[in-house]
Amino acid sequence: MAGKTLYDKLWDSHLVKQRDDGSALIYIDRHIIHEVTSPQAFEGLRLAGRKPWRIDANIATPDHNVPTTPERKGGIEAIADQVSRLQVQTLDDNCDEYGIVEFKMNDVRQGIVHVIGPEQGATLPGMTVVCGDSHTSTHGAFGALAHGIGTSEVEHVLATQCLVAKKMKNMLVRVEGTLPFGVTAKDIVLAVIGKIGTAGGNGHAIEFAGSAIRELSVEGRMTICNMSIEAGARVGLVAADEKTVAYVKGRPFAPKDAEWDLAVEAWKDLVSDADAKFDTVVELDAAQIKPQVSWGTSPEMVLAVDQNVPDPAKEMDLVKRDSIVRALKYMGLSANQAITDIQLDRVFIGSCTNSRIEDLRAAAVIAKGRKVASTIKQAIVVPGSGLVKAQAESEGLDKIFLEAGFEWREPGCSMCLAMNPDRLESGEHCASTSNRNFEGRQGAGGRTHLVSPAMAAAAAVSGRFVDVRELI
């Protein structure tokens, strides 16, 4: 019998029923809830006279709409936007009504859903994990089958603890070799997207493997899996190993005592078999990857920091040529312009991609002893959770950022998306550690450039993009 991929094993172990139409019913182990995609789901339960099927499989926190400034200490009433305030209050009310564990806005455990799940040990190897957010793929870094779902599916999972889904194809992205000094997980995943495009992973679950992936920390792997959706794949996976086990051990939701020993033994099988067959294989040489910067309005529009913006006149494909022309116009850039000549207005270090303690440490190394350039209007650092914030402060990272001229904020999704007060003005260029650079993503007319935390910090102190390796 042919070997199985990691994705195959996870799928098969959660398959409840295969349906005649090609879809299947799978069991969901963990459901993470936030304020934006859950109100209608809870109301649907209420109207149908149902209750959540398994209370302890759910955890919740507000993140998308919460302000990151100190005023939020005043509670929900401090949220200025009426819709945002209502969504956060509704999440609190729904979780209180049904007894669902929620880390409310001013709880130290509050944070971005894809930070607090792993941080609490609520994400474990071998699990199925869903959330009403497309970057749920983040949790695949633990050898878990994780992906985003829509609001109607949120209701379905709440009511039944199951989900109707179709099995995906298998893609292997193998990154072998040693990363050059100063090159990070964010650079790997941007390079992958640049290679295969934003549709490259459509219909696939991507397993990231190879020596360069194994060398990454668990937090680095989360960054990789987080952006699998930007490569077109709803699911990103990294096989569980000793790093995974060490990260999870002792966390609040992790198994204890004898159950822990049994779990660790079971997790050893969460790898693709040596003879497993993948539908698509993509290979990258880690040694060839440089610090990356997105220049356009799609994550696939990405280049190494030492390259120039493309010239549409040199593009033979008419569709691609038109997209380059449109992106250049929106971004206010010129053909053949050097990436290092792009002048910046704001810098954002945060998001579910890059707001964990290792990300903040990497940025602080660059910020230490330097000052934010006078041409930068604002540079903000937004920890991914209250616990990340507390850890960073215990290490003195907040002081490094503040002394350099950065703003040190409360946890939340912040400037990743224009659903809270942190946003760009039209025409502003932002070096951002987030995951999407679509038109208007960070604010109407805002121009987003995706980079690693270290590259963002380097841009902040330089006023433009520079090769971070020159500052280390």
UniProtKB/Swiss-Prot annotation:
An example Gene Ontology biological process: L-leucine biosynthetic process
EC number, UniProt record: 4.2.1.33
Family: Belongs to the aconitase/IPM isomerase family. LeuC type 1 subfamily.
Disulfide bonds: none
GO MF, one example: 4 iron, 4 sulfur cluster binding
Protein name: 3-isopropylmalate dehydratase large subunit
Record text on subunit structure and interactions: Heterodimer of LeuC and LeuD.
